[in-house]
C-alpha cells in the first residue's frame, strides 16, 4: 500500500466511523476506487486505523472513565451484549453479505429510515437529554437495534443512533451514546482481528501504518467534535439524503 493510499483510507475511516453512513461501506468502495486489493496485510492495516478511531473516543470522553459514571458504563455494556453475541455466532454468515450491491442497497434503505425518523421526530423535554440519564431498558433496545449494523452498508453508528431516537433520546444524546457504545464494539472487533492477523504485520511496511493511524485519529477526533455541534442545530436529514444518493451512485457505478 502506498503512503497516499494509507492517508486517504485513514481519513475515510476517521470521518465515517462515527457518522451514520457506514465506515465499512466507504472503506470497501474507496479501496476499490484506489485499486487496493483485499490482502491480509491490508486487512491488518484496517485494524490499525480502527484502533486510532477508538483512541479518539478515549480522548474526547476521558472524564467519563471513573467510578462515578458506573451506571453509564453498565448501560453501555447492556447495549453491547446483543451485537457481541449475535456477531460471534453468525460472523461467517455476515461476511458472505460483503458485496458492493448489498452495501449499496442498505445505504439506500438506511437513508430512507433516517428521513422517516426525522419526519416522525418530536422534540421536547420528554426526551432523554443526557447520556447519564439512560435507563437499562433504553440501553437494551438500542443494543437490539444495533444488531442490524452487522449487515454491510447499514452503519453501526446509524443503527445505534436510530435506536436511541426511537427509545426517546434526543439527537445529541443518541449520537453521544453511540460514540461510547462504539468502544466495546470496536475493541472486540479489533481484538479478534488482531488475533487473526498479527502475523501479517511482519510483512507490512510500518510507514503506511503510521500515516494511516495518524490520519484516522485526527479525522475521528475532529468528526466527533463537529458532529455534536452539528446536531445542536441541524437534523439527520442530510445524512439520509447522502446515503440514498451514495447508494444509487454505487448501483450505477459498480453493479
UniProtKB/Swiss-Prot annotation:
GO terms for molecular function: undecaprenyl-diphosphatase activity. Its EC number is 3.6.1.27. It is found in: Cell inner membrane. It is an enzyme of class 3 (hydrolase). GO terms for biological process: cell wall organization; peptidoglycan biosynthetic process; regulation of cell shape; response to antibiotic. The chain crosses the membrane at residues 1-21, 41-61, 70-90, 97-117, 139-159, 175-195, 208-228, 234-254. Belongs to the UppP family. Bacitracin is thought to be involved in the inhibition of peptidoglycan synthesis by sequestering undecaprenyl diphosphate, thereby reducing the pool of lipid carrier available. This is Undecaprenyl-diphosphatase. It comes from Hydrogenovibrio crunogenus (strain DSM 25203 / XCL-2).
Amino acid at each position: 500500500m502506498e503512503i497516499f493510499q494509507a492517508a486517504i483510507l485513514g481519513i475515510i475511516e476517521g470521518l465515517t466511523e462515527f457518522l451514520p453512513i457506514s465506515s465499512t461501506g466507504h472503506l470497501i468502495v474507496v479501496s476499490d476506487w484506489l485499486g487496493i486489493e483485499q490482502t491480509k496485510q491490508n486487512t491488518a492495516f484496517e485494524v490499525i486505523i480502527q484502533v486510532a478511531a477508538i483512541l479518539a473516543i478515549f480522548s474526547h470522553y476521558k472524564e467519563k472513565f471513573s467510578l462515578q459514571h458506573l451506571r453509564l458504563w453498565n448501560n453501555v455494556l447492556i447495549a453491547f451484549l446483543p451485537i457481541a453475541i449475535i456477531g460471534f455466532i453468525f460472523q461467517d454468515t455476515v461476511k458472505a453479505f460483503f458485496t458492493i450491491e448489498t452495501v449499496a442497497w442498505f445505504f439506500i434503505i438506511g437513508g430512507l429510515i433516517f428521513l422517516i425518523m426525522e419526519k416522525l421526530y418530536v422534540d421536547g423535554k420528554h426526551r432523554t437529554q443526557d447520556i447519564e440519564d439512560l435507563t437499562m431498558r433504553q440501553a437494551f433496545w438500542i443494543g437490539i437495534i444495533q444488531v442490524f449494523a452487522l449487515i454491510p452498508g447499514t452503519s453501526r453508528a446509524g443503527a445505534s443512533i436510530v435506536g436511541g431516537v426511537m427509545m426517546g433520546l434526543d439527537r445529541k444524546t443518541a449520537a453521544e451514546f453511540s460514540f461510547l457504545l462504539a468502544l466495546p464494539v470496536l475493541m472486540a472487533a479489533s481484538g479478534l482481528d488482531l488475533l487473526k492477523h498479527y502475523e501479517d504485520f511482519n510483512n507490512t511496511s510500518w510507514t503506511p501504518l503510521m500515516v494511516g493511524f495518524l490520519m484516522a485519529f485526527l479525522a475521528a477526533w475532529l468528526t466527533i467534535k463537529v458532529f455534536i455541534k452539528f446536531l445542536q442545530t441541524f437534523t439527520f436529514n442530510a445524512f439520509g439524503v447522502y446515503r440514498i444518493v451514495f447508494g444509487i451512485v454505487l448501483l450505477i457505478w459498480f453493479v
